[in-house]
C-alpha cells in the first residue's frame, strides 16, 4: 500500500514530469516518488541557546525518516529569543513570531503537499506556533522539543535566566556585589537548551506530552544529552507510522486532550502564557474552549510539583524524579486525566502510562502525591472586575499578601516603568499599571519580565502589585496580573486609570477592581481618544490590524 496520500499530487502522473525533474536534482530516485514525503520543520538558530542545539535533533530525525523508508524534506522556521529581546522594542515581535512560525509551517507543508511533518523547536513561541500549525492543517505531525538547559551555578546556588533578571534589581538596590552580579550573569546559562524552570517553553512542551502530540519523557530531557537525540529519532519513526495509519492531529487534539494538557500545566505550576496559547491552539483545531475552562480545571487540579519560578527545582530535576509521565500517572489515578484520549503513538494515555509507578519515588522532593499537594487548587486564575470585564490572568498560589489595595502608578510603556522601579520611585503598597501593551496596542503583547524581576530584586515582590494588558514571562511570580481585557488601545477600563486611583487585586475573590465610581468612569470614557497606532508598516502593523483580544488567544486568523 502506498502512503503518499498527499504528495502524489505533486509527484505522480505525466503532468508532474517537470516536478519530478526538480526532485531528481535533489537526489531522488524513481522509487522515491511512491514514498511519503515527511517535512522536518527546523527551528535551529544561533540567535539563542534555546535553539542553538537543535541541528543534532533535526539530523537524527532526518536519518530516522530515511530509515523508515520515507523522504525527509527539511525547511526552516524562525525564532525570537524572548530572554534576549526582553525589556526592549524587540519583545513586541515575540508573540508575533508564534503566528509567523505557524504560517511558515502551514505554507511549506501545504505548498509542497507533504504527507506528514516533524516540528523541531526550542524557544517559547516555537511550541505554540508549531502546534497551532499542526492543529490548523491537520496533517499527521509530531512535536519534538529541543530540550531544557541545565541549571547554572554560582557560589553554591542554582541559577536560571530569571536569576540574572532579578539580579538587576538586587544590584541597583545595593543588595548584591559587583562580583556576584557578574558571577550570576556569566553562569546563569551554562549550556544549550530552553530556560530551565517551569517557564513558558517547558510549560508548553510538558503539556504536549499530556496533549498526546509529543513522546513521553521528551519534554524534560536536557538538550545536550544523547537521550534527547535518541528521542528525536524515535519521534520521527513514530510520525512515519502515524502517516501510515493516517492518524491526524485532530484525532488527538480534542477538548478532552486539551483538558489533560491544562491539568498538567496546573499540576506543575506552569506559565500564564499557556492560557493564551491553548486558546489559540483550540481555535486552530476548531474546539470550543474559553478562559472559563481554565478556571474550571484550576478548581479541581492541585499543584503537586515544586518547580521554579515560585518553587525550588528545575526541569532536569523533574526529569530525574520521573518526568511528566509520573505527574500524569498521579493525575490519572486521581481521576483528573482522561485516560481514553489518543496519542501520536496510536495508544491511549492510559496505555502509555500503564508501566509508570503509581507512587512517586521516595528519594525525590520535586513531585508530591495528590494527598500531599503543595496547593489544593491550581495556580493560574482568571480574574474579573471593572478593570477586566473580559478577564485577566494571574498566578495566585504562594502569595503572602493575596489581597492588595493601593494607589495606581500609571505607565504607558515598559521602559518608563522599569526606570521608575530602578530609581526607587515605586513604594510598598503601590499598584503599577502598565498599559497600551496589548495585542493591538503594544502591539504584540510584550512580556514584562524586566519590571517584575526588578520589583522582586528590589525586595518589593510581596508588597507591590502590577497589572498589564501585556503578558508576563513564564519566569514571573508575585502579585502580578496580565492579559487584561479589554486592552487599553480599544478603550478598556485600564485606559481610564489615573495616577493615584485606588486599585484592588484580590486573589481570594478573583477580583481586579478600579475603585472609582461609575459616573467618574463614564466622564473619563467620554473624554478618552484612541491613540494613533505605534506602527503603520511592517509585521507589527499587520499583527495589530489582525489580532483578536487576549481572551481569544490573540490569534490573527
UniProtKB/Swiss-Prot annotation:
Binding, Mg(2+): 82, 124-125, 447
Statement: the UniProt record of this protein carries the keyword Magnesium: yes
SUPFAM superfamilies (UniProt xref): IlvD/EDD N-terminal domain-like, LeuD/IlvD-like
Cofactor or coenzyme needed: [2Fe-2S] cluster; Mg(2+)
A GO MF term: dihydroxy-acid dehydratase activity
UniProt keyword list: 2Fe-2S, Amino-acid biosynthesis, Branched-chain amino acid biosynthesis, Iron, Iron-sulfur, Lyase, Magnesium, Metal-binding
Record text on cofactor binding: Binds 1 [2Fe-2S] cluster per subunit. This cluster acts as a Lewis acid cofactor.
One Pfam assignment: ILV_EDD_C
Enzyme class: lyase
Catalytic residues (UniProt): 473
Chain sites annotated for binding [2Fe-2S] cluster: 50, 123, 195
N6-carboxylysine PTM sites in chain numbering: 125
Role of this protein: Functions in the biosynthesis of branched-chain amino acids. Catalyzes the dehydration of (2R,3R)-2,3-dihydroxy-3-methylpentanoate (2,3-dihydroxy-3-methylvalerate) into 2-oxo-3-methylpentanoate (2-oxo-3-methylvalerate) and of (2R)-2,3-dihydroxy-3-methylbutanoate (2,3-dihydroxyisovalerate) into 2-oxo-3-methylbutanoate (2-oxoisovalerate), the penultimate precursor to L-isoleucine and L-valine, respectively.
NCBIfam families hit by this protein: ilvD, PRK00911.1
UniProt protein name: Dihydroxy-acid dehydratase
Gene coding for it: ilvD
